[in-house]
Amino acid sequence: MSDDKYHHDKHHDKHHIDSKQSTAAALSSSSTLASSSSMTTTTTTTSTTTTAASPITPKPRKNYPNSADQYELKETIGKGGSGLVQRAICLPFQENVAIKIIDLEHCKNVSLEEIRKEIQAMSLCHHPNVVAYHTSFVYNESLWVIMDFLSAGSCSDIMRFSFPQGFEEHVIATILKEALKAICYFHKTGRIHRDIKSGNILIDSNGNIQLSDFGVSATLIDTGETSRNTFVGTPCWMAPEIMEQVNYDYAVDIWSFGITALELARGKAPFAEYPPMKVLLLTLQNPPPSLEGDGESKWSHSFKDLVEKCLQKDPSKRPLPSKLLEHRFFKQAKKPDYLVQHILAKLPPLGQRYQMLSEDSFAMLRNTSSPQFDTGHSNSADEWIFPNENNDNNNSSTTTTTTTTTTTNPSNNNNNNNNKTKENLTQSPFETPSHTPSTSPGSTPSHSRTSTPTSNHTALGSSSTVVPPPVVPLTLPTAIPVTAAAYHQQQQHHHLSHSSGSIPNHNASSNLGASAHSNVHGLAHSSIHPTSSAASTTVVNNTQQPQTLQPPQQQHQLQQPIKTPSPINAINIVKLNQSDLITPPKTSPKKEGSIPSSSSHGNIPSLVTTSPKSPLQHQQQIPQQQQDPAMINSNNSSISSNGAYNRELISASGSALSKPPSPSSDKENNSTSKSNKSKSRQSSRASSLSESSDSTSHTSSSDEHSSRYESDRKSYKKKKSSSSSSNSKRDRERERDRDRSNKTYKNSRSRNVSRDRERERDRHNRSRDRDRERERERDRDRERDRDRSRDRSRDRSRDRERDRSRDRSRDRDRSRDRSRDRSRERDRDRSRDRSRDRSRSRDSDSRDRSRDRSRSHSNRRRSRSRDSRNKSRDRSSDSDRSRDRSRDRDYKSSKYKKSSRGTSGRKNNKIQSKLDSQATHISYLEDKISTLTNWLQQQNLLNTSNGQVLSPTDPNLVSKLQTQLDVLQSENSYLRNENINLKTIVNGSNSTNNSLNQSSGMAFRNSVSSLHQLNMSNSSNNSRPQTQ
């Protein structure tokens, strides 16, 4: 569309309209359509979207004109369910529109009620995914419906032209998602579409998807019902509940949506190759169709799941459209630009595509002999785009017949279908019966290159002869209605003409209607004997109806394509013109009951179809005697059986019939007396002289002939009476000899004529056989060329399909490889992350364990040291007590001296244990002093590295360390003093105590020196200026 911005702006509302006003508008438009021929329906309802805060006023819609002169029709783009669709230009807006033209007088497939429903549904729909309806009006007994023009056509048309195997999955997801939005809108507004298929899904030039064809949509809001039970839809897409004619609801559109998904995937709907009744049986009896048979790797699991959910025979198990929009399959849907790049970029324009599809389908239909491809009875209501077929108009009140002159062969009837030639068409002057036989494409005769010469002819009496008339154009009399008796007589006449090879003789008193009926029937249904097909002529004579010429306008109206009632036998006019042995019909002497002379009829013109005569043929006709029509009728069967050439003469009443004389009739007529012989010669001379005169001079020539005949007879009597009796015998002998010689001459002449006729017949048969063989050879060559072209086209299509399948397989392989590489990279990254996490967790665990161990060890050491201190303290207190007691006991009596020795040994043991605990505690203090000393040395080294001070030590830290060292020193000195006191008590402990004192003194001295150095460095650092 040229105005895409407006197209989206006028559909920006949320589809909430006043349903009562819209329905009333549609109903009023439909009532006007049924009652008046000047109906004009324009949808002017503007939908509004209101919110709780403030109303939003939409932009005004365009008012399209309601007159046909404001639109310029362009090419045909297809046919819908109820009419022809053409592209047009709206002249006021200069934009493309689609016009559906519906013939209200001859609409066979739809009724006015269906048209009303379709217009009502279109006028109430306003959605970006629904084809927009502008206006409608009546023009020349046709309803014009103006809609948006979607230049890409339907999905079915695109698949038939470029994608016969179906679309890829991304394209299907894009199309189905937009179509599902339109279905959601329909269901929200209380409507059922009931005919969702790819032929009703249209695409514009920008890749936007819209749903069309509301001819079978049902509205549930009008009546307040919750279900429908009408049998509407296309069989392949029809839900099972519609086939069973039970109550159904919105779920039927979900079934059709699933079938449409299969159609877009495979290129055709399930059971599309079967007739409608079998489709109904297969749908009801078989399980629902699915994508399982197409292979596991072709379609994704989400697509299969979508189709399976939609195609549930139980309507309650089918999901809602709003739920289907949330399906994971639609995550692969693309933007409209994707369709433009991958689908619409390589397509020709819609009109050109429609013409190409029409030509291909028409050629396929003509080249096949199957009855299911009959072009005269095709149903074009299925698709938006389909072949251009000539449908018969069964509703017309009158029919027309085709009069053609052909040269055909029964063996090549099927091949003549491909020869497109113009037909000489004339309107029939009578009404054909209601059951008119139709011809199939295989039996349509080809048309000849020559026309049949016609001439006027007048039925003459006894003394009149046939005058060669000039050639005039063939015209038929005016139309005369046919009665029942005339129709019965026509059927009997047709049956006899086909059975015997000649038309029966009827009574001259037949009515005018039967006469006209038989005349035209003789033109259209004349049957010629096989042996005389090249030499027969058809004569039509109007005795009571004057000849009228058709005006140019009427003759132009007669040139319209119609179907011929039956094929017409061949008449080769070239062979007729070249023949020298064809004689015109002879007139017989006037007798009672014979045909009336020209004086009784007057100068009434007639229509004669005959062939020109050669001079030799005219000379041979002069000496022959005239025959009676009764004799000709009696010898008709013998003439046709002997293979002689027939000459048919149809008079005004269809009763007069004359044929050329046979040799047997010549022999009988020549065996008469001498007087009859002279009469025949004189009559032949008179007939030869009268050929150059008109009808008024025939009477005078007949009077001259009679007077001469009387005078010759009188002179002959006188001579005969004056002859002597002596010469009578000799004269009789002479007469006998003359009679014999005349008989032999006539016999030889008749033999020669018959021989010449046989030779000419054989020559004609040979030439006809040669022509037939040539025609057969030509037909064979044409068939060969057609087969070759078909094979080439099939090979090309196969190659194209192979290339497409290869490209698809390559793309699939590439996508698979990419997905595999991506999955492998993901797996590698995951494994790396896992290994890193594991190593980090292991390191952290090991650190935690080591920390825990160190802490546990330190805690254990501290607890041990505390226990040892407590024990040593207890021991020291016990030792002091025991010492005091021992002193007290020493001053007592001597009886306690023995017991004190035993107790002193025990005390020594306790003191030894206390000394051991003090030794361990002293070692712990030394370790702690050494660690502090090492730390101080490291800090000193770091501060004084490379002769520069990196960072000065905090004096608070140094003071804390000093206090800690003091505490340790005091504790150590206390332990040493206690140890000295105890060594006096325990013997042999001097060496260990001295070692302890030396080690503890060295550790203390080291710690004091390191602390002193650290203090010196701090003081030096404080004295220097801080440059960093």
Curated annotation (Swiss-Prot):
The catalytic residues are D195
Taxonomy, superkingdom: Eukaryota
Q: Where does ATP bind?
A: I77, G78, K79, G80, G81, S82, G83, L84, V85, K100
SMART domains, sorted: S_TKc (SM00220)
Q: Does the keyword Membrane apply?
A: no
**What InterPro entries does this protein's entry cite?**
Kinase-like_dom_sf (IPR011009), Prot_kinase_dom (IPR000719), Protein_kinase_ATP_BS (IPR017441), STRAD_A/B-like (IPR047173)
Name-wise, this protein is Serine/threonine-protein kinase fray2
Q: Organism source for this protein? A: Dictyostelium discoideum
Q: What lineage is on file?
A: Eukaryota, Amoebozoa, Evosea, Eumycetozoa, Dictyostelia
